[in-house]
Amino acid sequence: MKRTIQETPGPSSTTVPPPKKLNSQRNGSNLEPGSIYFTPIGGISVPRQESESSRSLDEILADIRPINSLHFSFMLDFEFLIGSYPPSLREYPITLVVGAPDAPDLLKCTKNQKLVTVVGASLPIPFGTHHTKMSILEDEDGRFHVIVSTANLVPDDWEFKTQQFYYNFGVKIASGTVPRSDFQDDLLEYLSMYRNQLDTWKQLLQKVDFSQISDRLIFSTPGYHTDPPTQRPGHPRLFRILSEKFPFDASYEHTERCTFVAQCSSIGSLGSAPINWFRGQFLQSLEGANPSPKQKPAKMYLVFPSVEDVRTSCQGYAGGCSVPYRNSVHARQKWLQGNMCKWRSNAKRRTNAVPHCKTYVKYDKKVAIWQLLTSANLSKAAWGEVSFNKSKNVEQLMIRSWEMGVLITDPSRFNIPFDYPLVPYSATDEPFVTDKKHEKPDILGCIWTPP
């Protein structure tokens, strides 16, 4: 499948009120540092029909006014991206990072752009993808703006879906010592995984002060990782950072079962039983240094659109292209349906916009404790699977894909996209799958026939 171009589907039918304007912050833009925003509904092929706290790509770029840009994406439509820049800023350097198989097509699209550099990220394990969605933008005043997103750089992802992005920034230090920060360390460690392909950006970011940022980057990089667990990416990295943020508390009373919610747009093969991975090593990483007692095991739910959720969405069944779960996979893990909940976002007025965002949240005594916004879906390919390599006599973590997310532990900055309490699937609900025919007409009068 070509991943560098994506056509824009039909019009949206969602109607929501106009956005609230934020005051300009000390970062020189209208974006609040440390905040999570939604992308708009409409605004490209149809009139914009806003939801609160949303920003379009052209608004972001007009606010920041980058003179040097680094974009990571899975799918990338260059004409859409460059068209989102203000005309006066289209002749500045842009570096684009995609999966190595997609780099040749992108090079063809940008062959007349002298200041555009294309980087192809290595995908050493079959079926892996370069799934990271992140932008680092340098402005003329020496600020470096970091955006961690769930949206690909294609029109449909920025118009008809429930997407989110996280924003923050740092300031270049002209001379003297740059204060050390975990956020900067995270960023530089991730860029190092591209070997020497992004060394120029590493050198720039080494001179940037990110010390005001308390949030942490949670990322995955492909490969067979045999280094110590504390140095591994994927879900072991989440375990380590959660353990640092929330050390073991022997005095804590488990009066209720804590709840973990995963919300994603695709699901991988998780095994024939939940203990294989879902409630095994993945849940153990979500719990960090504070595992639930055996008498009160953690509850774990998955928010994923049902057939009816997609059928009644603003794009109808076409919106289901962004939630590519397959019936052939679901048939092997029917146990998962008992954990599934419908997509509901009435509080944010986005129930009718199919979710492409990915969110992981811990609730304790019905209160959200942390939120993770990420590109990583619920899959071993994204988060990794620990196994023992008998031939090498070593434990290894196998990850197929590149992923990027940000962990926020400050409740005042949470922006959880789904409603809580959750709405479980009914006895007649089924998850939307792309390889099964759906004959009941959708909101646009169409049926779904598998491609």
Curated annotation (Swiss-Prot):
Keywords: DNA damage, DNA repair, Exonuclease, Hydrolase, Nuclease, Nucleus, Repeat. The keyword Hydrolase applies. Residues 266-269 are annotated as: Interaction with DNA. The keyword Oxidoreductase does not apply. Substrate binds at residues 133, 358. Residues 1-34 are annotated as: Disordered. Its EC number is 3.1.4.-. One of its GO terms (biological process) is DNA repair. The active site is at 131 (nucleophile), 356 (proton donor/acceptor). SUPFAM superfamilies: Phospholipase D/nuclease. One of its GO terms (cellular component) is nucleus. GO terms for molecular function: 3'-tyrosyl-DNA phosphodiesterase activity; double-stranded DNA binding; exonuclease activity; single-stranded DNA binding. It is an enzyme of class 3 (hydrolase). It is found in: Nucleus. The record marks 379 as: Interaction with DNA. It holds the Pfam family Tyr-DNA_phospho. Belongs to the tyrosyl-DNA phosphodiesterase family. PANTHER family: TYROSYL-DNA PHOSPHODIESTERASE 1. DNA repair enzyme that can remove a variety of covalent adducts from DNA through hydrolysis of a 3'-phosphodiester bond, giving rise to DNA with a free 3' phosphate. Catalyzes the hydrolysis of dead-end complexes between DNA and the topoisomerase I active site tyrosine residue. Hydrolyzes 3'-phosphoglycolates on protruding 3' ends on DNA double-strand breaks due to DNA damage by radiation and free radicals. Acts on blunt-ended double-strand DNA breaks and on single-stranded DNA. This is Probable tyrosyl-DNA phosphodiesterase. It comes from Caenorhabditis elegans. The lineage of its organism: Eukaryota, Metazoa, Ecdysozoa, Nematoda, Chromadorea.
